[in-house]
């Protein structure tokens, strides 16, 4: 269907797009489809590659700026380079996997989409497990290939930086994840996609750019989590007490941020609550007519 060919339902509602129906919470029939397992595998591989490239970049940055090892600030990629590595990999991997799994690569994104009824509980849990396993394997490969530098430079693990309290750390993770998940909702909004055929193709770009911008802002505070799988995988392989003590920050913050973004987009910007209220009023009116 082209944008100029409206169905009778669309004409009556005055809409030139169709919202996809909400996904059932318990959609067990997915377990019988190969496309489901293909999507889970895609999430595993994408998260593995994401952690492999980004953690290598972080360790390379720290080794190049280590004065004791003959490095210097001008010899490294800097925070800008690290941010580009994270944002660039998200752009690449979302572009590659969007048509297969939706390109989540992040339990917080999956959680936000689940709350918005975009994915089922079965798919959400499976994605999160695959993402955490992929992240762990990705960091494991980094340790194998960079065994000399891995433990010396912190293993790319997320930890609350000195001088910041827990509240600041959690707040940074909440706001950072809100920016990311809000961008995901906006970039994949069917209303916007219906009006511009280029939007679906370009969606990975703003998503990756949001990751880049959030990293610039929050690397000094928490090292930037906004992705529980990224934080979990690094903590498992690095296995440092402080990394484990701070681990909850990188789950609570992102999940709260994702929940707020889902609520804001669905019930404020898309007026989900008003639509539901209007539907109930219409049904009650028909019953009493």
Curated annotation (Swiss-Prot):
InterPro entries: Aquaporin-like (IPR023271), Aquaporin_transptr (IPR034294), MIP (IPR000425), MIP_CS (IPR022357). GO terms for cellular component: Golgi apparatus; plasma membrane. It comes from the Eukaryota. The modification N-acetylmethionine is found at residue 1. It is found in: Cell membrane. Keywords: Acetylation, Cell membrane, Membrane, Phosphoprotein, Repeat, Transmembrane, Transmembrane helix, Transport. A motif (NPA 2) lies at residues 227-229. The modification Phosphoserine is found at residues 11, 279, 282. Aquaporins contain two tandem repeats each containing three membrane-spanning domains and a pore-forming loop with the signature motif Asn-Pro-Ala (NPA). Belongs to the MIP/aquaporin (TC 1.A.8) family. PIP (TC 1.A.8.11) subfamily. NCBIfam families: MIP. This is Probable aquaporin PIP2-6. It comes from Arabidopsis thaliana (Mouse-ear cress). The gene is PIP2-6.
